[in-house]
Regions:
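N-terminal Rossmann-like NAD(P) cofactor-binding subdomain of oxidoreductases
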Residues: 1-138
Length: 138
C-alpha cells in the first residue's frame, strides 16, 4: 500500500483524499488542517486521521471535539508521498519539510512552476512525469 498524506484538507485536499481513498493500492495516512472547522469534522467522519500544522493549537481542536493525531511533520514522516493542497504560496514553504524526510511530493493548487521544476498535465506530458520525485499539477 502506498501511504499518502494530504497536507491541506480544504476545497482541493478533500477531493484528493477521497480519490486516493478509493484506490485499492493507496491509503490515506492523514490529512491536515490549520483550524478546527467543519472540514475537520468531515475528515473525521470519513475516517481520515487529522494532523495539525501548529501543534500549539491542539487544545483548540480537542475543545471543539476534534481529536488530533499529531503534527503535520509527524504525518509527513509516516507517508510515502505527500499531496500538498495548501493555499497558494504556502506549499512552497513546505518543500524543505518534504525534502527533510525525503518524501515525494505533488503540489495541487496555486503554486508556481518553480516549486517542483515540473508542471504536470496528463494530456501533454504524462510520460515525462513518470519517475519524478516532485511535480506540480496544473
Amino acid at each position: 500500500m502506498i501511504k499518502v498524506a494530504v497536507n491541506g484538507y480544504g476545497t482541493i485536499g478533500k477531493r484528493v483524499a477521497d480519490a486516493v481513498a478509493a484506490q485499492p493500492d493507496m491509503e490515506i495516512i492523514g490529512v491536515s488542517k490549520t483550524k478546527p472547522g467543519a472540514e475537520a469534522f468531515v475528515a473525521l467522519e470519513r475516517g481520515y486521521p487529522l494532523y495539525i500544522a501548529d501543534i500549539s493549537k491542539k487544545e483548540a481542536f480537542e475543545k471543539a471535539g476534534i481529536p488530533v493525531a499529531g503534527s503535520v511533520e509527524e504525518m509527513i514522516a509516516k507517508a510515502d508521498i505527500v499531496v500538498d493542497a495548501t493555499p497558494g504560496g504556502v506549499g512552497v514553504s513546505n518543500k524543505e519539510l518534504y525534502a527533510k524526510y525525503q518524501k515525494k511530493a505533488i503540489w495541487q493548487g496555486g503554486e508556481d512552476h518553480e516549486v517542483a521544476g515540473f508542471s504536470f498535465n496528463s494530456s501533454c506530458n504524462y510520460a515525462e512525469a513518470l519517475g519524478r520525485d516532485t511535480a506540480r499539477v496544473v
